[in-house]
UniProtKB/Swiss-Prot annotation:
Organism per entry: Scheffersomyces stipitis (strain ATCC 58785 / CBS 6054 / NBRC 10063 / NRRL Y-11545) (Yeast)
EC number(s) given by UniProt: 3.6.4.13
Subcellular location(s) of the protein: Nucleus, Nucleolus
Name of the gene encoding the protein in the UniProt record: HAS1
Identification of the protein by name: ATP-dependent RNA helicase HAS1
Domain remark from Swiss-Prot or TrEMBL: The Q motif is unique to and characteristic of the DEAD box family of RNA helicases and controls ATP binding and hydrolysis.
Protein backbone atom coordinates (compact mmCIF):
# COMPACT_ATOMS: atom_id res chain seq x y z
CA UNK A 1 0.00 0.00 0.00
CA UNK A 2 1.29 3.46 -0.88
CA UNK A 3 2.67 5.50 1.96
CA UNK A 4 4.05 8.95 2.53
CA UNK A 5 7.73 9.65 3.07
CA UNK A 6 8.38 10.28 6.74
CA UNK A 7 11.73 11.03 8.30
CA UNK A 8 12.85 9.76 11.66
CA UNK A 9 14.55 13.08 12.20
CA UNK A 10 11.30 14.85 13.06
CA UNK A 11 11.33 13.98 16.76
CA UNK A 12 13.84 15.35 19.25
CA UNK A 13 15.78 17.49 16.87
CA UNK A 14 19.17 18.14 18.36
CA UNK A 15 19.46 14.55 19.59
CA UNK A 16 18.51 13.15 16.21
CA UNK A 17 21.10 15.27 14.44
CA UNK A 18 23.80 14.11 16.87
CA UNK A 19 22.88 10.47 16.39
CA UNK A 20 22.75 11.01 12.64
CA UNK A 21 26.21 12.55 12.55
CA UNK A 22 27.87 10.74 15.57
CA UNK A 23 37.00 -23.79 -13.73
CA UNK A 24 35.93 -27.51 -12.76
CA UNK A 25 35.24 -29.11 -16.22
CA UNK A 26 32.03 -27.78 -17.67
CA UNK A 27 29.35 -30.30 -18.71
CA UNK A 28 28.21 -30.63 -22.29
CA UNK A 29 24.89 -28.97 -23.10
CA UNK A 30 21.90 -31.25 -22.86
CA UNK A 31 18.60 -29.74 -23.88
CA UNK A 32 16.23 -32.57 -22.96
CA UNK A 33 13.12 -32.96 -20.85
CA UNK A 34 12.53 -35.29 -17.92
CA UNK A 35 10.27 -35.32 -14.88
CA UNK A 36 13.25 -35.29 -12.51
CA UNK A 37 14.59 -32.21 -14.29
CA UNK A 38 11.26 -30.44 -13.82
CA UNK A 39 11.22 -31.19 -10.09
CA UNK A 40 14.83 -30.05 -9.67
CA UNK A 41 14.11 -26.91 -11.65
CA UNK A 42 11.12 -25.92 -9.57
CA UNK A 43 13.22 -26.34 -6.45
CA UNK A 44 16.01 -24.22 -7.92
CA UNK A 45 13.59 -21.56 -9.06
CA UNK A 46 12.43 -21.22 -5.47
CA UNK A 47 16.02 -21.00 -4.22
CA UNK A 48 17.07 -18.46 -6.83
CA UNK A 49 13.95 -16.29 -6.59
CA UNK A 50 15.45 -14.03 -3.95
CA UNK A 51 13.56 -11.23 -2.32
CA UNK A 52 14.79 -7.67 -2.85
CA UNK A 53 15.38 -7.19 0.87
CA UNK A 54 17.58 -10.30 1.00
CA UNK A 55 19.66 -9.01 -1.88
CA UNK A 56 19.86 -5.55 -0.37
CA UNK A 57 21.24 -6.88 2.90
CA UNK A 58 24.27 -8.27 1.09
CA UNK A 59 25.21 -5.06 -0.72
CA UNK A 60 28.28 -2.98 -0.05
CA UNK A 61 30.42 -0.03 -1.15
CA UNK A 62 29.93 2.39 -4.00
CA UNK A 63 31.64 2.73 -7.37
CA UNK A 64 33.78 5.80 -7.91
CA UNK A 65 34.50 7.65 -11.13
CA UNK A 66 37.98 7.17 -12.72
CA UNK A 67 40.21 9.95 -13.99
CA UNK A 68 39.66 10.98 -17.58
CA UNK A 69 42.04 9.94 -20.36
CA UNK A 70 44.35 12.52 -21.95
CA UNK A 71 42.86 14.52 -24.83
CA UNK A 72 45.55 13.55 -27.36
CA UNK A 73 44.91 9.88 -26.72
CA UNK A 74 41.18 10.40 -27.13
CA UNK A 75 41.67 12.15 -30.47
CA UNK A 76 43.85 9.33 -31.81
CA UNK A 77 41.28 6.83 -30.63
CA UNK A 78 38.45 8.80 -32.22
CA UNK A 79 40.15 8.66 -35.63
CA UNK A 80 40.76 4.94 -35.25
CA UNK A 81 37.14 4.43 -34.22
CA UNK A 82 35.81 6.33 -37.22
CA UNK A 83 37.86 4.19 -39.61
CA UNK A 84 36.90 0.94 -37.90
CA UNK A 85 33.19 1.67 -37.65
CA UNK A 86 33.04 2.20 -41.42
CA UNK A 87 33.01 -1.59 -41.87
CA UNK A 88 29.78 -1.81 -39.92
CA UNK A 89 26.51 -1.36 -41.74
CA UNK A 90 23.96 0.11 -39.41
CA UNK A 91 20.61 0.50 -41.15
CA UNK A 92 18.62 2.84 -38.96
CA UNK A 93 15.04 1.86 -38.24
CA UNK A 94 13.09 4.97 -39.11
CA UNK A 95 10.36 5.83 -36.69
CA UNK A 96 6.99 7.21 -37.77
CA UNK A 97 4.59 9.03 -35.48
CA UNK A 98 1.74 6.84 -36.73
CA UNK A 99 3.81 3.72 -36.35
CA UNK A 100 4.62 1.68 -33.25
CA UNK A 101 1.66 3.13 -31.35
CA UNK A 102 -0.81 0.25 -31.56
CA UNK A 103 1.51 -2.74 -31.59
CA UNK A 104 0.20 -5.24 -29.09
CA UNK A 105 2.21 -7.84 -27.21
CA UNK A 106 -0.33 -10.50 -28.17
CA UNK A 107 0.60 -10.00 -31.84
CA UNK A 108 4.34 -10.52 -31.26
CA UNK A 109 4.17 -14.34 -31.23
CA UNK A 110 5.36 -14.68 -27.64
CA UNK A 111 5.10 -17.87 -25.59
CA UNK A 112 2.11 -18.51 -23.33
CA UNK A 113 4.11 -18.19 -20.06
CA UNK A 114 5.54 -14.85 -21.16
CA UNK A 115 2.15 -13.54 -22.27
CA UNK A 116 0.62 -14.51 -18.92
CA UNK A 117 3.35 -12.58 -17.12
CA UNK A 118 2.93 -9.51 -19.33
CA UNK A 119 -0.80 -9.62 -18.69
CA UNK A 120 -0.19 -9.91 -14.93
CA UNK A 121 2.04 -6.83 -15.15
CA UNK A 122 -0.78 -4.90 -16.83
CA UNK A 123 0.86 -4.30 -20.20
CA UNK A 124 -1.03 -4.63 -23.48
CA UNK A 125 0.55 -2.21 -25.96
CA UNK A 126 4.24 -1.88 -26.74
CA UNK A 127 6.19 1.35 -26.48
CA UNK A 128 8.05 2.53 -29.57
CA UNK A 129 11.39 1.05 -28.54
CA UNK A 130 9.71 -2.28 -27.72
CA UNK A 131 7.87 -2.40 -31.05
CA UNK A 132 11.07 -1.62 -32.95
CA UNK A 133 13.40 -3.87 -30.93
CA UNK A 134 11.53 -7.03 -29.91
CA UNK A 135 10.80 -8.44 -33.44
CA UNK A 136 14.42 -8.28 -34.72
CA UNK A 137 15.72 -9.65 -31.43
CA UNK A 138 13.24 -12.54 -31.61
CA UNK A 139 14.58 -13.15 -35.13
CA UNK A 140 18.11 -13.53 -33.73
CA UNK A 141 19.65 -10.26 -34.90
CA UNK A 142 22.26 -8.30 -33.00
CA UNK A 143 20.99 -4.86 -32.03
CA UNK A 144 22.59 -1.56 -31.12
CA UNK A 145 19.78 0.48 -29.61
CA UNK A 146 19.34 4.13 -28.71
CA UNK A 147 16.21 5.44 -27.01
CA UNK A 148 15.05 8.16 -24.67
CA UNK A 149 15.27 7.31 -21.00
CA UNK A 150 12.00 5.93 -19.64
CA UNK A 151 11.10 4.38 -22.99
CA UNK A 152 10.59 0.81 -21.78
CA UNK A 153 13.82 -0.76 -23.02
CA UNK A 154 14.13 -3.15 -20.05
CA UNK A 155 11.18 -5.16 -21.36
CA UNK A 156 12.56 -4.69 -24.88
CA UNK A 157 15.62 -6.80 -24.12
CA UNK A 158 14.30 -9.08 -21.35
CA UNK A 159 11.34 -10.46 -23.33
CA UNK A 160 13.48 -11.74 -26.26
CA UNK A 161 16.10 -13.06 -23.82
CA UNK A 162 13.50 -15.05 -21.87
CA UNK A 163 11.88 -16.30 -25.08
CA UNK A 164 15.30 -17.56 -26.22
CA UNK A 165 15.79 -19.56 -23.01
CA UNK A 166 12.25 -20.93 -23.28
CA UNK A 167 12.62 -22.00 -26.92
CA UNK A 168 15.88 -23.82 -26.15
CA UNK A 169 14.31 -25.50 -23.09
CA UNK A 170 17.21 -24.42 -20.90
CA UNK A 171 17.74 -26.44 -17.70
CA UNK A 172 19.87 -25.53 -14.69
CA UNK A 173 22.51 -28.08 -15.75
CA UNK A 174 22.93 -26.14 -19.03
CA UNK A 175 24.25 -23.21 -17.00
CA UNK A 176 23.88 -19.58 -18.00
CA UNK A 177 22.24 -18.86 -21.35
CA UNK A 178 21.74 -15.09 -21.04
CA UNK A 179 23.81 -12.47 -19.22
CA UNK A 180 22.57 -8.91 -18.67
CA UNK A 181 25.29 -6.44 -17.67
CA UNK A 182 24.20 -3.31 -15.80
CA UNK A 183 26.34 -0.34 -14.65
CA UNK A 184 25.04 -0.01 -11.08
CA UNK A 185 23.74 -2.26 -8.34
CA UNK A 186 20.47 -0.37 -8.02
CA UNK A 187 19.76 -0.71 -11.74
CA UNK A 188 20.75 -4.40 -11.64
CA UNK A 189 18.29 -4.93 -8.77
CA UNK A 190 15.59 -3.18 -10.74
CA UNK A 191 16.20 -5.33 -13.85
CA UNK A 192 16.20 -8.40 -11.58
CA UNK A 193 12.78 -7.39 -10.26
CA UNK A 194 11.36 -7.04 -13.78
CA UNK A 195 12.90 -10.38 -14.79
CA UNK A 196 11.34 -12.05 -11.77
CA UNK A 197 7.89 -10.84 -12.83
CA UNK A 198 8.41 -11.86 -16.46
CA UNK A 199 9.61 -15.35 -15.46
CA UNK A 200 6.82 -16.02 -12.97
CA UNK A 201 5.32 -18.72 -15.22
CA UNK A 202 8.59 -20.04 -16.68
CA UNK A 203 10.67 -22.91 -15.27
CA UNK A 204 14.05 -21.41 -16.18
CA UNK A 205 16.20 -20.11 -13.34
CA UNK A 206 17.41 -16.56 -12.82
CA UNK A 207 19.73 -14.74 -10.45
CA UNK A 208 21.84 -11.67 -9.74
CA UNK A 209 25.52 -11.10 -8.92
CA UNK A 210 26.59 -7.61 -7.82
CA UNK A 211 29.47 -6.01 -6.00
CA UNK A 212 29.15 -5.99 -2.23
CA UNK A 213 26.95 -9.09 -2.08
CA UNK A 214 28.02 -12.40 -0.52
CA UNK A 215 30.32 -13.83 -3.17
CA UNK A 216 30.33 -17.38 -1.77
CA UNK A 217 26.53 -17.60 -1.86
CA UNK A 218 26.55 -16.26 -5.41
CA UNK A 219 29.12 -18.89 -6.45
CA UNK A 220 27.02 -21.69 -4.94
CA UNK A 221 23.97 -20.61 -6.90
CA UNK A 222 25.95 -20.21 -10.11
CA UNK A 223 27.23 -23.77 -9.68
CA UNK A 224 23.63 -25.01 -9.37
CA UNK A 225 22.75 -23.27 -12.63
CA UNK A 226 21.42 -19.77 -13.29
CA UNK A 227 19.91 -19.55 -16.78
CA UNK A 228 19.32 -15.77 -16.80
CA UNK A 229 21.98 -13.79 -14.95
CA UNK A 230 21.89 -10.05 -14.16
CA UNK A 231 25.28 -8.68 -13.13
CA UNK A 232 27.47 -5.65 -12.59
CA UNK A 233 30.76 -5.73 -14.57
CA UNK A 234 33.28 -6.11 -11.76
CA UNK A 235 31.52 -8.97 -9.97
CA UNK A 236 30.72 -10.75 -13.26
CA UNK A 237 34.38 -10.69 -14.30
CA UNK A 238 35.35 -12.02 -10.87
CA UNK A 239 33.02 -15.02 -11.24
CA UNK A 240 34.05 -15.66 -14.85
CA UNK A 241 37.70 -15.82 -13.81
CA UNK A 242 37.50 -17.49 -10.42
CA UNK A 243 34.25 -19.42 -9.83
CA UNK A 244 34.57 -23.14 -10.51
CA UNK A 245 31.34 -24.73 -11.63
CA UNK A 246 30.06 -21.54 -13.28
CA UNK A 247 28.86 -22.95 -16.62
CA UNK A 248 28.78 -20.20 -19.23
CA UNK A 249 30.01 -22.03 -22.34
CA UNK A 250 26.40 -22.41 -23.50
CA UNK A 251 25.82 -18.64 -23.47
CA UNK A 252 23.36 -17.67 -26.20
CA UNK A 253 22.81 -13.96 -25.57
CA UNK A 254 24.65 -11.02 -24.01
CA UNK A 255 22.83 -7.80 -23.09
CA UNK A 256 24.80 -4.66 -22.24
CA UNK A 257 22.47 -2.07 -20.75
CA UNK A 258 23.40 1.60 -20.28
CA UNK A 259 26.69 0.97 -22.11
CA UNK A 260 27.72 4.62 -22.02
CA UNK A 261 27.28 4.73 -18.25
CA UNK A 262 29.25 1.47 -17.82
CA UNK A 263 32.16 3.10 -19.64
CA UNK A 264 31.78 6.46 -17.87
CA UNK A 265 32.27 4.92 -14.43
CA UNK A 266 35.45 3.10 -15.41
CA UNK A 267 34.52 -0.42 -16.51
CA UNK A 268 36.00 -0.27 -20.02
CA UNK A 269 38.80 -2.77 -19.34
CA UNK A 270 36.49 -5.10 -17.40
CA UNK A 271 34.03 -5.15 -20.30
CA UNK A 272 36.80 -5.95 -22.78
CA UNK A 273 37.93 -8.87 -20.61
CA UNK A 274 34.36 -10.11 -20.13
CA UNK A 275 33.71 -10.09 -23.88
CA UNK A 276 37.03 -11.86 -24.51
CA UNK A 277 36.18 -14.64 -22.01
CA UNK A 278 32.58 -15.24 -23.12
CA UNK A 279 31.93 -17.63 -26.04
CA UNK A 280 31.36 -15.87 -29.35
CA UNK A 281 29.89 -18.64 -31.50
CA UNK A 282 26.13 -18.47 -31.91
CA UNK A 283 25.93 -15.64 -29.39
CA UNK A 284 23.36 -12.93 -29.97
CA UNK A 285 24.27 -9.55 -28.51
CA UNK A 286 22.24 -6.49 -27.62
CA UNK A 287 23.79 -3.18 -26.63
CA UNK A 288 21.71 -0.27 -25.37
CA UNK A 289 23.02 3.22 -24.79
CA UNK A 290 21.33 6.58 -24.32
CA UNK A 291 24.25 8.29 -26.06
CA UNK A 292 26.47 7.05 -28.88
CA UNK A 293 30.07 7.97 -27.95
CA UNK A 294 33.29 6.73 -29.52
CA UNK A 295 33.83 4.40 -26.58
CA UNK A 296 30.35 2.95 -27.03
CA UNK A 297 31.12 2.39 -30.72
CA UNK A 298 34.33 0.65 -29.69
CA UNK A 299 32.45 -1.62 -27.29
CA UNK A 300 29.81 -2.34 -29.95
CA UNK A 301 32.51 -3.29 -32.41
CA UNK A 302 33.99 -5.99 -30.18
CA UNK A 303 30.72 -7.28 -28.71
CA UNK A 304 28.34 -7.28 -31.69
CA UNK A 305 28.59 -9.38 -34.84
CA UNK A 306 29.34 -7.45 -38.07
CA UNK A 307 26.29 -5.71 -39.48
CA UNK A 308 24.17 -5.20 -36.35
CA UNK A 309 20.79 -3.57 -36.64
CA UNK A 310 20.92 0.02 -35.39
CA UNK A 311 17.65 1.11 -33.84
CA UNK A 312 17.09 4.71 -32.91
CA UNK A 313 13.51 5.63 -32.07
CA UNK A 314 14.53 9.25 -31.45
CA UNK A 315 15.05 11.22 -34.69
CA UNK A 316 17.91 13.72 -34.45
CA UNK A 317 15.52 16.64 -34.88
CA UNK A 318 13.29 15.52 -32.02
CA UNK A 319 13.45 16.87 -28.51
CA UNK A 320 15.91 14.94 -26.35
CA UNK A 321 13.46 14.71 -23.45
CA UNK A 322 10.05 13.10 -23.01
CA UNK A 323 7.04 14.66 -24.72
CA UNK A 324 5.04 14.82 -21.49
CA UNK A 325 7.72 16.79 -19.65
CA UNK A 326 7.25 20.51 -18.90
CA UNK A 327 10.68 22.06 -18.42
CA UNK A 328 11.71 25.36 -16.99
CA UNK A 329 14.46 27.28 -15.24
CA UNK A 330 14.61 30.08 -12.72
CA UNK A 331 17.34 32.71 -12.44
CA UNK A 332 18.25 33.15 -8.80
CA UNK A 333 21.19 34.68 -6.93
CA UNK A 334 23.18 32.22 -4.84
CA UNK A 335 22.03 33.65 -1.50
CA UNK A 336 18.35 33.13 -2.41
CA UNK A 337 18.69 29.55 -3.69
CA UNK A 338 17.91 27.71 -0.46
CA UNK A 339 15.11 30.13 0.45
CA UNK A 340 13.48 29.48 -2.93
CA UNK A 341 13.94 25.71 -2.57
CA UNK A 342 12.45 25.76 0.93
CA UNK A 343 9.45 27.79 -0.28
CA UNK A 344 8.94 25.46 -3.24
CA UNK A 345 9.06 22.29 -1.14
CA UNK A 346 6.62 23.79 1.36
CA UNK A 347 4.19 24.73 -1.41
CA UNK A 348 4.37 21.33 -3.11
CA UNK A 349 4.60 19.16 0.00
CA UNK A 350 1.86 16.85 -1.33
CA UNK A 351 3.82 16.12 -4.51
CA UNK A 352 6.55 13.56 -5.23
CA UNK A 353 9.79 15.47 -5.83
CA UNK A 354 13.44 14.63 -6.54
CA UNK A 355 16.03 17.33 -5.76
CA UNK A 356 19.46 16.92 -7.38
CA UNK A 357 22.62 18.29 -5.78
CA UNK A 358 26.23 18.10 -6.94
CA UNK A 359 27.96 16.45 -3.97
CA UNK A 360 27.42 13.83 -1.28
CA UNK A 361 28.19 16.27 1.53
CA UNK A 362 25.66 18.78 0.19
CA UNK A 363 23.00 16.07 0.10
CA UNK A 364 23.90 15.04 3.64
CA UNK A 365 23.72 18.62 4.96
CA UNK A 366 20.52 19.72 3.25
CA UNK A 367 18.89 16.40 4.14
CA UNK A 368 19.73 16.92 7.82
CA UNK A 369 18.74 20.59 7.72
CA UNK A 370 15.36 20.06 6.05
CA UNK A 371 14.46 17.24 8.43
CA UNK A 372 15.56 19.36 11.40
CA UNK A 373 13.26 22.24 10.41
CA UNK A 374 10.26 19.94 10.00
CA UNK A 375 10.33 19.48 6.24
CA UNK A 376 10.75 15.68 5.99
CA UNK A 377 12.94 14.35 3.17
CA UNK A 378 14.82 11.19 2.26
CA UNK A 379 18.44 11.42 1.13
CA UNK A 380 20.46 9.25 -1.26
CA UNK A 381 24.14 9.57 -2.18
CA UNK A 382 27.18 7.48 -3.05
CA UNK A 383 28.87 7.61 0.36
CA UNK A 384 26.01 5.75 2.02
CA UNK A 385 26.26 2.02 2.59
CA UNK A 386 24.59 0.08 -0.18
CA UNK A 387 21.90 -1.32 2.11
CA UNK A 388 20.77 2.18 3.11
CA UNK A 389 20.82 3.32 -0.52
CA UNK A 390 18.68 0.36 -1.56
CA UNK A 391 16.24 0.74 1.34
CA UNK A 392 15.87 4.49 0.66
CA UNK A 393 15.32 3.83 -3.05
CA UNK A 394 12.51 1.35 -2.43
CA UNK A 395 10.95 3.52 0.28
CA UNK A 396 10.74 6.46 -2.12
CA UNK A 397 9.49 4.21 -4.94
CA UNK A 398 6.60 3.06 -2.72
CA UNK A 399 5.79 6.56 -1.46
CA UNK A 400 2.81 8.42 -2.86
CA UNK A 401 4.30 11.82 -1.99
CA UNK A 402 7.48 13.21 -0.49
CA UNK A 403 10.93 14.53 -1.36
CA UNK A 404 14.18 12.74 -2.19
CA UNK A 405 17.39 14.78 -2.00
CA UNK A 406 20.14 13.04 -3.96
CA UNK A 407 23.26 13.16 -6.11
CA UNK A 408 23.35 11.81 -9.66
CA UNK A 409 23.40 8.26 -8.22
CA UNK A 410 19.64 8.27 -8.92
CA UNK A 411 19.84 10.02 -12.28
CA UNK A 412 20.45 7.07 -14.55
CA UNK A 413 18.18 4.20 -15.53
CA UNK A 414 16.27 3.88 -12.27
CA UNK A 415 12.50 3.73 -12.65
CA UNK A 416 10.87 5.63 -9.78
CA UNK A 417 7.08 5.68 -10.18
CA UNK A 418 4.94 8.82 -10.44
CA UNK A 419 7.52 11.56 -9.84
CA UNK A 420 5.83 14.96 -10.20
CA UNK A 421 8.81 17.32 -10.09
CA UNK A 422 12.55 17.17 -10.80
CA UNK A 423 14.43 20.04 -9.15
CA UNK A 424 18.03 20.64 -10.28
CA UNK A 425 19.15 22.70 -7.29
CA UNK A 426 22.80 22.40 -8.37
CA UNK A 427 23.30 22.64 -12.14
CA UNK A 428 24.20 19.52 -14.15
CA UNK A 429 27.65 19.08 -15.64
CA UNK A 430 26.45 18.96 -19.24
CA UNK A 431 23.26 18.45 -21.32
CA UNK A 432 23.54 14.66 -21.06
CA UNK A 433 23.42 14.85 -17.27
CA UNK A 434 20.47 17.24 -17.51
CA UNK A 435 18.58 14.80 -19.75
CA UNK A 436 19.22 11.85 -17.44
CA UNK A 437 18.11 13.82 -14.39
CA UNK A 438 14.81 14.93 -15.89
CA UNK A 439 14.33 11.41 -17.23
CA UNK A 440 13.22 10.34 -13.72
CA UNK A 441 9.81 11.90 -14.45
CA UNK A 442 7.36 11.73 -17.39
CA UNK A 443 8.35 8.10 -17.91
CA UNK A 444 6.55 5.79 -20.31
CA UNK A 445 4.55 6.58 -23.44
CA UNK A 446 1.97 8.77 -21.67
CA UNK A 447 4.01 9.96 -18.71
CA UNK A 448 3.64 13.51 -17.38
CA UNK A 449 5.99 15.51 -15.20
CA UNK A 450 7.68 18.85 -14.59
CA UNK A 451 11.25 19.98 -14.05
CA UNK A 452 12.85 23.13 -12.68
CA UNK A 453 16.53 24.07 -12.89
CA UNK A 454 18.12 26.70 -10.65
CA UNK A 455 20.64 28.97 -12.44
CA UNK A 456 22.57 31.99 -11.22
CA UNK A 457 22.93 34.94 -13.64
CA UNK A 458 26.51 33.87 -14.48
CA UNK A 459 25.33 30.35 -15.44
CA UNK A 460 22.83 31.36 -18.14
CA UNK A 461 25.31 30.31 -20.83
CA UNK A 462 24.31 26.71 -20.09
CA UNK A 463 21.02 27.37 -21.88
CA UNK A 464 22.89 27.54 -25.21
CA UNK A 465 24.12 23.99 -24.73
CA UNK A 466 20.63 22.76 -23.87
CA UNK A 467 19.20 24.47 -26.95
CA UNK A 468 21.83 22.77 -29.12
CA UNK A 469 20.77 19.45 -27.55
CA UNK A 470 17.10 20.06 -28.51
CA UNK A 471 15.98 20.62 -24.93
CA UNK A 472 13.02 23.05 -24.79
CA UNK A 473 12.90 25.26 -21.67
CA UNK A 474 10.79 28.14 -20.43
CA UNK A 475 11.84 30.73 -17.88
CA UNK A 476 9.85 30.65 -14.65
CA UNK A 477 9.54 33.60 -12.31
CA UNK A 478 8.78 33.45 -8.61
CA UNK A 479 7.42 36.60 -6.95
CA UNK A 480 9.71 37.81 -4.18
CA UNK A 481 6.79 38.09 -1.75
CA UNK A 482 6.11 34.36 -2.19
CA UNK A 483 9.59 33.35 -1.01
CA UNK A 484 9.72 32.54 2.71
CA UNK A 485 12.65 34.43 4.24
CA UNK A 486 14.10 32.25 6.99
CA UNK A 487 17.70 33.44 6.49
CA UNK A 488 18.11 34.91 9.99
CA UNK A 489 16.68 31.79 11.65
CA UNK A 490 18.92 29.60 9.47
CA UNK A 491 21.98 31.63 10.42
CA UNK A 492 21.19 31.36 14.16
CA UNK A 493 20.62 27.61 13.85
CA UNK A 494 23.96 27.01 12.11
CA UNK A 495 25.77 29.10 14.73
CA UNK A 496 24.16 27.35 17.68
CA UNK A 497 24.18 23.72 16.51
CA UNK A 498 27.71 22.28 16.33
CA UNK A 499 26.77 19.21 14.27
CA UNK A 500 24.78 21.15 11.68
CA UNK A 501 27.58 23.74 11.52
CA UNK A 502 30.14 21.06 10.68
CA UNK A 503 27.82 19.45 8.16
CA UNK A 504 27.14 22.85 6.54
CA UNK A 505 30.87 23.54 6.27
CA UNK A 506 31.48 20.15 4.62
CA UNK A 507 28.60 20.78 2.23
CA UNK A 508 29.89 24.25 1.35
CA UNK A 509 33.40 22.95 0.68
CA UNK A 510 32.11 20.07 -1.46
CA UNK A 511 29.85 22.42 -3.42
CA UNK A 512 32.85 24.60 -4.35
CA UNK A 513 34.93 21.53 -5.16
CA UNK A 514 32.20 20.14 -7.43
CA UNK A 515 31.74 23.56 -9.04
CA UNK A 516 35.45 23.83 -9.79
CA UNK A 517 35.34 20.35 -11.36
CA UNK A 518 32.65 21.17 -13.94
CA UNK A 519 33.67 20.38 -17.52
CA UNK A 520 32.00 23.46 -19.01
CA UNK A 521 34.54 25.96 -17.68
CA UNK A 522 33.14 28.81 -19.77
CA UNK A 523 29.77 28.44 -18.02
CA UNK A 524 30.76 27.39 -14.51
CA UNK A 525 33.55 29.75 -13.49
CA UNK A 526 34.42 29.48 -9.83
CA UNK A 527 36.13 32.89 -9.95
CA UNK A 528 32.75 34.44 -10.77
CA UNK A 529 31.05 32.95 -7.72
CA UNK A 530 30.12 35.39 -4.99
CA UNK A 531 31.33 33.31 -2.05
CA UNK A 532 29.48 35.44 0.50
CA UNK A 533 26.20 34.72 -1.27
CA UNK A 534 27.07 31.03 -1.73
CA UNK A 535 27.88 30.78 1.98
CA UNK A 536 24.51 32.32 2.86
CA UNK A 537 22.75 29.52 1.01
CA UNK A 538 24.45 27.15 3.49
CA UNK A 539 23.47 29.30 6.48
CA UNK A 540 26.74 31.21 7.02
CA UNK A 541 26.95 34.97 7.45
CA UNK A 542 30.67 34.81 6.67
CA UNK A 543 32.20 32.23 4.29
CA UNK A 544 34.06 29.55 6.26
CA UNK A 545 37.69 28.89 5.38
CA UNK A 546 37.96 25.87 3.10
CA UNK A 547 40.62 24.24 0.97
CA UNK A 548 39.59 22.82 -2.37
CA UNK A 549 41.96 20.69 -4.40
CA UNK A 550 40.15 20.34 -7.75
CA UNK A 551 40.13 23.20 -10.22
CA UNK A 552 41.33 25.83 -7.76
CA UNK A 553 43.82 26.07 -4.94
CA UNK A 554 42.94 26.62 -1.33
CA UNK A 555 45.14 29.71 -1.44
CA UNK A 556 43.03 31.42 -4.12
CA UNK A 557 39.87 30.67 -2.17
CA UNK A 558 41.41 32.14 0.98
CA UNK A 559 42.30 35.35 -0.88
CA UNK A 560 38.83 35.65 -2.28
CA UNK A 561 37.35 35.14 1.18
CA UNK A 562 39.40 38.01 2.58
CA UNK A 563 38.59 40.30 -0.34
CA UNK A 564 34.86 39.66 -0.06
CA UNK A 565 34.94 40.11 3.73
CA UNK A 566 36.47 43.59 3.28
CA UNK A 567 33.81 44.43 0.73
Amino acid sequence: MAKNVNSKANGKKSGSVKRALKEKKQPEPEFSDSEDDEVDQEKLVEELDEDFDEVANMLGADVTDPEEKKQSKLERKRKRDEEATAEYTKPEVVDNEDDAQNDKFEDAGLSEPTMRAISDMGFKTMTKVQAKTIPPLLAGKDVLGAAKTGSGKTLAFLIPAIELLYSLKFKPRNGTGVIVVSPTRELALQIFGVARELMAHHTQTFGIVIGGANRRQEAEKLAKGVNLLIATPGRLLDHLQNTQGFVFKNLKALVIDEADRILEIGFEEEMKQIIKILPKEERQSMLFSATQTTKVEDLARISLRPGPLYINVVPETAASTADGLEQGYVVCDSDKRFLLLFSFLKKYSKKKIIVFLSSCNSVKYFGELLNYIDLPVLDLHGKQKQQKRTNTFFEFCNAKQGTLVCTDVAARGLDIPAVDWIIQFDPPDDPRDYIHRVGRTARGSNGKGKSLMFLTPSELGFLRYLKAANVPLNEYEFPTNKIVNIQSQLSKLIKSNYWLHQSAKDGYRSYLQAYASHHLKTVYQIDKLDLVKVAKSFGFDVPPKVNITIGASGKSIEKKHKKQKRA
